[in-house]
Amino acid sequence: MSKTGGSDSKNTLYCSFCGKSQHEVRKLIAGPTVFICDECVELCMDIIREESKSSLVKSRDGIPTPKEIRKVLDDYVIGQDHAKKVLSVAVHNHYKRLNHATKHGDVELAKSNIMLIGPTGSGKTLLAQTLARILDVPFTMADATTLTEAGYVGEDVENIILKLLQAADYNVERAQRGIVYIDEIDKISRKSDNPSITRDVSGEGVQQALLKIMEGTVASVPPQGGRKHPQQEFLQVDTTNILFICGGAFAGLDKIISSRSKGGTSIGFGAKVAPVEERRPGELFREVEPEDLLKYGLIPEFIGRLPVLATLNDLDEAALKQILAEPKNALVKQYQRLFEMENVDLTIHEEALGAIARKAIERKTGARGLRSIMEGILLDTMFDLPGLEGVEEVVISKEVVEQNARPLYIYADRVGDAGASA
């Protein structure tokens, strides 16, 4: 860190690009007659990354290879190697199919929508968001729990297409090549195995409504959203080439898979029964079959529209520690950047990262719960820090996470804990 003192303004050095002084930045790098600060270096790196990403998308007639897709996914998503491989191939084939359709009319290639099955906080949403970013296509997310059949209180299925159109700045052609991610898809499972005589408007009814847009139809979308009115002019959007990715935690599906796999085992005193607890849900999900999803409550036609199944594993302590520190947008890096804005270094010990990961596992929230744990740990520090002078570094140890101890504050001239400086 380049922090030189001295009150003489003549000796103060400035960044040649943003004009900040050496006292306002962490590092000032000297070149022949010019200086550049660490913030401008980061900005340049971001610009280069974006340009290299766009050149990746433009290569090979606009379709990145599965290996190229996987490489970018690795930068943002830790672990889940099987799911990343399945998604990379499926997405590559989908956009290759679109290019094929415009050039060859002899063989029609069917669309392969994707089902993501994995525990809460395992990275389903992040995978879908990252895919859209790689391919530079419009992307929208929908929550299946808010959807109802047309004519009932709730959100129409066709509103999903409206959101995609908005993401494409109302460019219909771009929207027709976009990606839709529908979360909590397991929550619209049929309420019982047997079809009911009463209308299931938020379960089977939504599955039926989604079928039409997933297989390909021309949706009439009201430009300003909401319910349709006879006087409105509608935008016509063909959903044939829109890639649908559905994700869900499918709580209890592991038990259905386990009971099926043990269906042929013997009974009695000599029977060897492996307890379900020996295998985690993520491991069992790898063995999922369409019949398991049918038993869970998805209708056969809906399962048929999602031929590509990608399963995600539970995240263990090692994976959660990696998620905290390693990706380009890792949580630790985000909080370090926030502290940098106060000219303070944030140091989190390796043991503290492990303690944070264990807390997330105990809460059964996966990676999704990491931010709330970090917020709780750093809340008092972030509240006090703007009003403190002379703090150069804040150190988070394992005791801060596990025993609610106070973080260590390192001042320019002394060391003290948060309590001593409050």
UniProtKB/Swiss-Prot annotation:
InterPro entries: AAA+_ATPase (IPR003593), ATP-dep_Clp_protease_ClpX (IPR050052), ATPase_AAA_core (IPR003959), Clp_ATPase_C (IPR019489), Clp_protease_ATP-bd_su_ClpX (IPR004487), ClpX_bact (IPR046425), P-loop_NTPase (IPR027417), Znf_CppX_C4 (IPR010603). Keywords: ATP-binding, Chaperone, Metal-binding, Nucleotide-binding, Zinc. Component of the ClpX-ClpP complex. Forms a hexameric ring that, in the presence of ATP, binds to fourteen ClpP subunits assembled into a disk-like structure with a central cavity, resembling the structure of eukaryotic proteasomes. One of its GO terms (cellular component) is HslUV protease complex. One of its GO terms (biological process) is proteolysis involved in protein catabolic process. Transmembrane segments: none annotated. ATP-dependent specificity component of the Clp protease. It directs the protease to specific substrates. Can perform chaperone functions in the absence of ClpP. SMART domains: AAA, ClpB_D2-small, zf-C4_ClpX. Pfam families: AAA_2, ClpB_D2-small, zf-C4_ClpX. The gene is clpX. ATP binds at residues 119-126. Zn(2+) binds at residues 15, 18, 37, 40. SUPFAM superfamilies: Glucocorticoid receptor-like (DNA-binding domain) (SSF57716), P-loop containing nucleoside triphosphate hydrolases (SSF52540). The keyword Lipid biosynthesis does not apply. Residues 3-56 form the ClpX-type ZB domain. This is ATP-dependent Clp protease ATP-binding subunit ClpX. Belongs to the ClpX chaperone family. GO terms for molecular function: ATP binding; ATP hydrolysis activity; ATP-dependent protein folding chaperone; protein dimerization activity; unfolded protein binding; zinc ion binding.
